[in-house]
Amino acid sequence: MSVIGIVAEYNPFHSGHEFLLNQARLVSENDPIIVMMSGNYVQRGQMAIMDKWQRAKAALNSGADLVFELPFSFAVQPADIFANGSIRMLSNLGVSELFFGVEDANLNFSYLGQKINQIPKNRMDFRDYTQTYATQYNEMVAREVGHEVNQPNMMLAVAYAVASEQLDTPLHLHPVTRLGSGHDDQLLQDKIISSATAIRNYCLHHPNDLIELKKYLPKGELAALEKQKVYPNWNLLFNFLKYRIESASLEELRSIYQMSEGLEYKMKEEIHNAEDFTSFLRQIKSKRYTYARLRRLCLYTLLNVTEKEMQASYQDVSTLLLGYNSRGRNYLKKIRKDVELPIISKVDKKNAASGTLGLQVRVDRLFEQIMGEDQNFGRRPIEVK
């Protein structure tokens, strides 16, 4: 039996995500599809626009059989850590086939993963502080293997391939060409499939008139979006971030995960006069750091995620089961006793005391305050029949 895996954020779930699930199902009609999905915070350092339970339900309604939460400790990270965590967890759950969307599905990603893993580690110790790490990495990959990977989904795809090739048994990779708008398109396009970025932007600017989104969303998802009273975004959170930076000492800021090279001084210096989050990012931006890297740092700061806490979380890695259907339930019964990765179906004080789940539950407290609904305690996996 083949087991299909997909790494996702679904922020929010749209027709492009449904297309990828359909492509996976065409290849393997009766085998389980497992989704490893980011929770209430996503890779580029922001809150998800819908909570993890609603997004998991959308995936199940569109063909996924099991949806697990990728812990915050891996979800809000650069591509290599994000990919490494998600691929290892999927592999542990028995996944043998990985489906992912890319701009160019003709590349041999397994070959790229093998070649990049052969590059000596000291060749990746980039020292050019006038360029971002991502830029230097992409230039190195282009130089070593002859392919540029400067588009967001291509970068993630290569990271998946690198992580897969580090497994004892690498996954079979199935790249699927993305349809419709580009990953970062800001505005809705006259296409069947829009970018998640454009959909989020539309929600923020037209919260009381979302009917325009209907053609870009699977059945039922427009109604779910319309029910929301709040669409989380950094403008909502900026005053909390401002208070956090202004009230924290330099020593406290220095302890934050990924705080480096004197960024605590720059944040302290610029936060007081910043009018909004966008202007603050511009003020602390340098050639060394991408905006995504700085957004993640701001999120770690807002949530008070320290280096010590992040590293401690990796000593006890688990995943929260968000939902399943009958095929997913049957597969889970079959593998549960043999899987090393702890699968959490119910959050309680004991399992939420430490590890990735402990950090996840703690940072979700802010999301709960914004959205007004519990995200962990008292919640059980969604069952779709």
Swiss-Prot record:
This is tRNA(Met) cytidine acetate ligase. InterPro entries: Rossmann-like_a/b/a_fold, tRNA(Met)_cyd_acetate_ligase. It is found in: Cytoplasm. GO terms for biological process: tRNA modification. Catalyzes the formation of N(4)-acetylcytidine (ac(4)C) at the wobble position of elongator tRNA(Met), using acetate and ATP as substrates. First activates an acetate ion to form acetyladenylate (Ac-AMP) and then transfers the acetyl group to tRNA to form ac(4)C34. It catalyses: cytidine(34) in elongator tRNA(Met) + acetate + ATP = N(4)-acetylcytidine(34) in elongator tRNA(Met) + AMP + diphosphate. HAMAP family: TmcAL (MF_01539). It comes from the Bacteria. ATP binds at residues 7-20, 101, 153, 178. GO terms for cellular component: cytoplasm. Keywords: ATP-binding, Cytoplasm, Ligase, Nucleotide-binding, RNA-binding, tRNA processing, tRNA-binding. One of its GO terms (molecular function) is ligase activity, forming carbon-nitrogen bonds. Its EC number is 6.3.4.-. Disulfide bonds: none annotated. Belongs to the TmcAL family. Its main location: cytoplasm. It comes from Lactobacillus gasseri (strain ATCC 33323 / DSM 20243 / BCRC 14619 / CIP 102991 / JCM 1131 / KCTC 3163 / NCIMB 11718 / NCTC 13722 / AM63).
